[in-house]
Amino acid sequence: MNKKVFAMTLGTALLAATTAFAGDLLVGGCIYKFDDTHMTNVRNSMKAEADALGIDLELQDSQNRQPLQNDQVDTFITKGVNALVLNPVDRTASAPLVDKAKAAGIPVVFINREPEADVIASYDKVFYVGARAEESGTQSGEMIVDYFKANPGADKNGNGKIEYIMLKGEQGHQDATLRTEYSQKAMRDGGFEIVELGSDNANWDKVQATDKMKGFISAVGIEHIEAILCNNDDMALGAIEALKAEGYNTGDPAKFIPVVGVDATAPALAAMADGSLLGTVLNDAKNQGIAAMRLAKLSAEGAEITNDAVGYEVTDGKYVWVPYVKVTQANYKDFQ
């Protein structure tokens, strides 16, 4: 081939490739920590939807450290991403991130951890995808109520009260607060007095939950514990490990304490199948991930954010609420 023709052909090809790349959307995502089971499911959904939409998605593990996440966001902004999808380590530290994105004209989609309303309102290109935590709390409490009504012997001392342990997410996390409050309310609304034998923050972590539960067992005696409510499945599974060490929740109906969690993760569904976990609540990671990536794409393109465009109901032009679903022994196989 003539060198001049080759050079022109190569130049044309490079220009075409550069143009094609320039037309792609680059989205930067930060997840508060990669080893959170639910957020692993969310980011897997995000990656699948990004591939389907032709988005170049770069994800960073913030390792549960807000300063690290701040640096990651700075790097993404310097890199010139078209949109950010953020799962903040500390939702109360979201304002500076929004300010930086706003100054650069970059849309921000928060997912799973909701910043304060004034932060979301501070920039017209900020959105939130999540679920209403009070729903999951209500459904968790209802499962305990249903169990006690169907199994009168669950009230070990026959005093008509549910004597329970509560394992919570991190201190100050909105979902932890609401799941706790509304699960307690649901038990009272179900006609029971409730007695909290112990409550502590296990920070969404299975190992911490096992340690906390062992402490409660030593403090109050396993024979007095009638129910265990956990703000997520990892903590529920951690609590079950502590129960199993005492010979409970291993198949003997006389040694069973109802435990409920939230998220409907694969390990939780497996625990439901073996009978060690009473129930959980589906925190729909798949649809949360899909909605987040669609919002990122539409906002980066300057498109109108409508229900039809996103494929989900958009509240106040900013919020996508993905409903929770109660997962019981009667329907858990539908979610496996």
Regions found by a protein language model. Name each.
Residues M1-A22:
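Gram-negative bacterial Sec-dependent N-terminal signal peptides
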Residues L25-S45, E49, L53, L57-T75, ...:
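Extracytoplasmic "Venus flytrap"
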Residues G28-G29, V81-P88, P107-I111, M166, ...:
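Periplasmic-binding protein-like
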Residues H38-A52, S136-S140, Q174-E193, Q208, ...:
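Short, solvent-exposed amphipathic alpha-helices that sit
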Residues D56, L97-E135, G153-E163, T265-A273, ...:
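Flexible loop/hinge segments that line or gate small-molecule binding clefts
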Residues Q69, F127-K161, A209-M213, A264-A268, ...:
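Hydrophobic alpha-helical segments within soluble ligand-binding/sensing domains
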Residues L86-A103, S183, L197-A271:
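Hydrophobic alpha-helical
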Residues G160-E163, L167-Q171, D175, G289-Q336:
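Hinge/cleft segment of the Venus flytrap/periplasmic-binding protein
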